């Protein structure tokens, strides 16, 4: 077991070494990030080729005798309202990553945050109201300007207070992902969330 000090109450909290002192695996973390980002892609981009655009079945003018350049269809990619030469199609970008690998990747990231001092533990995190101003005041008191806050359960006040801020994000233990963990300078975790993380990544 290892220990970490909470920044608000200065109490010692024991952490599971298997979760918070895991060997960093850069290749696995990269794979988890790429998989997560690809799975978030909609893949809805779609265009039409010359054969898919409606119309253009008739030759616009005779091959010879008009003095104009020859043309076979008004839906040529060279023409306005024509098809696209290399049209993009709907595509499924999703990738599969085994649960064990995904958990190990999260362990690697969390352990690295712990080693570098960017994992901050608080006894509890609650806002008295839903105002963004008060949420920012709370973060300024902790001297944290850019952070992901992980709670066991996200309350309405905390969610609404942080929703409009680009430098902060808030989530519960079940929705943590590798991209969010790496995106912010600090990761603030409550004591209750620490216990749930240990259960989830065991």
Curated annotation (Swiss-Prot):
The keyword Plastid does not apply. This is Large ribosomal subunit protein uL4. One of its GO terms (cellular component) is ribonucleoprotein complex. GO terms for molecular function: rRNA binding; structural constituent of ribosome. Part of the 50S ribosomal subunit. One of its GO terms (biological process) is translation. Residues 43-68 are annotated as: Disordered. It comes from Legionella pneumophila subsp. pneumophila (strain Philadelphia 1 / ATCC 33152 / DSM 7513). NCBIfam families: rplD_bact (TIGR03953). It comes from the Bacteria. PANTHER family: 50S RIBOSOMAL PROTEIN L4, LARGE RIBOSOMAL SUBUNIT PROTEIN UL4M. Keywords: Ribonucleoprotein, Ribosomal protein, RNA-binding, rRNA-binding. One of the primary rRNA binding proteins, this protein initially binds near the 5'-end of the 23S rRNA. It is important during the early stages of 50S assembly. It makes multiple contacts with different domains of the 23S rRNA in the assembled 50S subunit and ribosome. Belongs to the universal ribosomal protein uL4 family.
């Amino acid at each position: 077991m290892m220990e970490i000090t909470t920044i608000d109450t200065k109490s010692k909290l024991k952490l599971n070494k298997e979760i918070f002192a895991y060997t960093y695996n850069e290749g696995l973390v990269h794979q988890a990030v790429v998989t997560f980002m690809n799975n978030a892609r909609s893949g809805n981009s779609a265009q039409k080729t010359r054969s898919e655009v409606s119309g253009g079945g008739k030759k616009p003018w005779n091959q010879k005798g008009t003095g104009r350049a020859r043309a076979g269809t008004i839906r040529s990619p060279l023409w306005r309202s024509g098809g696209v030469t290399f049209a993009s199609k709907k595509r499924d970008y999703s990738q599969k990553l085994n649960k064990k690998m995904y958990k190990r990747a999260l362990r690697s990231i969390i352990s690295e945050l712990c080693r570098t001092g960017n994992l901050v533990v608080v006894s509890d995190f609650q806002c008295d109201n839903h105002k963004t101003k008060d949420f920012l005041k709370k973060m300024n008191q902790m001297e944290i300007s850019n952070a992901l806050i992980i709670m066991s359960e996200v309350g309405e006040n905390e969610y609404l207070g942080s929703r409009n801020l680009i430098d902060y994000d808030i989530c519960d233990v079940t929705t943590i992902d590798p991209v969010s963990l790496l995106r912010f300078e600090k990761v603030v975790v409550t004591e209750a969330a620490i216990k749930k993380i240990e259960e989830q990544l065991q």
